């Protein structure tokens, strides 16, 4: 019985697939092939005579009219119109182009060639050997009330919610971690050095991601231990897992957010002052955290610009005193900037300062 049902589903699926292919082919034939046939039947070059370099006389049949045209490299001139003479061959061609049977045969020859047949046959054979669970239906939504009063959803629904939440990972990574501060500081460093394309964006983003995971490792580990592991062992519900997982991120963001920004967005949201930091809602904390991160990144960038700005001023003054006003100062100052950055071990100094700025 199960085998009969399985083959019935496979047969129905194959029928739908073949029907779809035939329908799409008919659409292609209807809007493309017929137009080509009609255009070819309306116009035909009967004969042509070459008179010289890029000079020809051409006789063209357009439906029942025969035209004599003079053609050069620059223009086409209508010379004469011959009497309307329709040859039997031309009549047969027009009759064929308007005949339904001819169109059908031409369509079959065009679309159902050997390559098309082989492709459809291979696809049908592949679908015949698909496992039966490929045709399984969508499971029902099942939920029940837990002992603590919460609602527990079935595993397929939980999986669907989890896969859907993966689309928000880039937003979480950009707005709720240390990534924004790091990547802005690296971009400002590149501008201060005077090398707008080196290191390239891919390297800066990759280095920022690595440092983000390094800095956020304790928070991610706590989320894994307190939220994911109990949920994977069915000890807590998905609602409890989300609440537990948000607490470490909430604490991290609160510690990096300025009090002024929190008060500003709380005022915009018409919320009074909070007695405890844990009571701050995410809709207030998230914009406050982003604003604080931007301000901190610009402050770090300002301190990075100062030594390189001094080098630019010194080089410009020297060039002006030597009368070399046509020489770009950035060309001369770039080697000195790179030498200074390498001598002070700039990468290690900058990465150390960025890491310590999150755990001061």
UniProtKB/Swiss-Prot annotation:
It is found in: Cell membrane; Bacterial flagellum basal body. Coiled coil: none annotated. Pfam families: FliO, FliP. GO terms for biological process: bacterial-type flagellum organization; protein secretion. This is Flagellar biosynthetic protein FliP. The keyword Transferase does not apply. NCBIfam families: FliO_TIGR, fliP, PRK12797.1. The chain crosses the membrane at residues 10-28, 115-137, 152-174, 203-220, 297-319, 332-351. The keyword Acetylation does not apply. InterPro entries: Flagellar_biosynth_FliO, FliP, T3SS_IM_P. One of its GO terms (cellular component) is plasma membrane. It is a multi-pass membrane protein. Plays a role in the flagellum-specific transport system. Belongs to the FliP/MopC/SpaP family. It comes from Buchnera aphidicola subsp. Baizongia pistaciae (strain Bp). Keywords: Bacterial flagellum, Bacterial flagellum biogenesis, Bacterial flagellum protein export, Cell membrane, Membrane, Protein transport, Transmembrane, Transmembrane helix, Transport.
């Amino acid at each position: 019985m199960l085998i009969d049902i399985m083959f019935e589903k496979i047969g129905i699926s194959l029928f739908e697939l073949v029907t779809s292919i035939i329908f799409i082919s008919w659409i292609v034939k209807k809007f493309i092939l017929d137009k080509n046939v009609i255009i070819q039947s309306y116009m035909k070059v009967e004969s042509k005579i070459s008179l010289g370099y890029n000079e020809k006389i051409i006789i063209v049949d357009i439906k029942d009219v025969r035209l004599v045209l003079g053609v050069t490299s620059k223009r086409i001139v209508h010379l004469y119109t011959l009497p309307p003479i329709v040859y039997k061959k031309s009549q047969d061609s027009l009759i064929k182009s308007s005949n339904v049977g001819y169109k059908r045969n031409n369509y079959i020859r065009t679309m159902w060639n050997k390559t098309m047949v082989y492709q459809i046959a291979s696809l049908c054979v592949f679908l015949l050997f698909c496992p039966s669970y490929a045709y399984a239906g969508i499971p029902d939504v099942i939920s029940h009330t837990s002992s603590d009063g919460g609602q527990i959803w079935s595993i397929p629904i939980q999986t669907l919610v989890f896969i859907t939440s993966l689309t928000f990972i880039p937003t979480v990574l950009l707005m709720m971690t240390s990534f924004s501060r790091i990547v802005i500081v690296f971009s400002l460093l590149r501008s201060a050095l005077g090398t707008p394309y080196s290191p390239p964006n891919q390297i800066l983003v990759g280095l920022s991601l690595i440092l983000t995971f390094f800095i956020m490792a304790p928070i991610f580990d706590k989320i894994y231990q307190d939220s994911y592991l109990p949920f994977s062992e069915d000890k807590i519900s998905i609602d409890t897992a989300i609440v537990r997982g948000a607490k470490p991120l909430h604490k991290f963001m609160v510690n990096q957010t300025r009090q002024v920004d929190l008060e500003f967005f709380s005022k915009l949201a018409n919320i009074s002052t909070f007695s405890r930091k844990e009571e701050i809602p995410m809709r207030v904390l998230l914009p406050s955290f982003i604003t604080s991160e931007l301000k901190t990144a610009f402050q770090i960038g300002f301190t990075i610009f100062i030594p390189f700005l001094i080098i630019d001023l010194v080089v410009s003054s020297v060039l002006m005193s030597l009368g070399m006003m046509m020489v770009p100062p950035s060309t001369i100052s770039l080697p000195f900037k790179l030498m200074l950055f390498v001598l002070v071990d700039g990468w290690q100094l900058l990465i150390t300062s960025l890491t310590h700025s999150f755990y001061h």
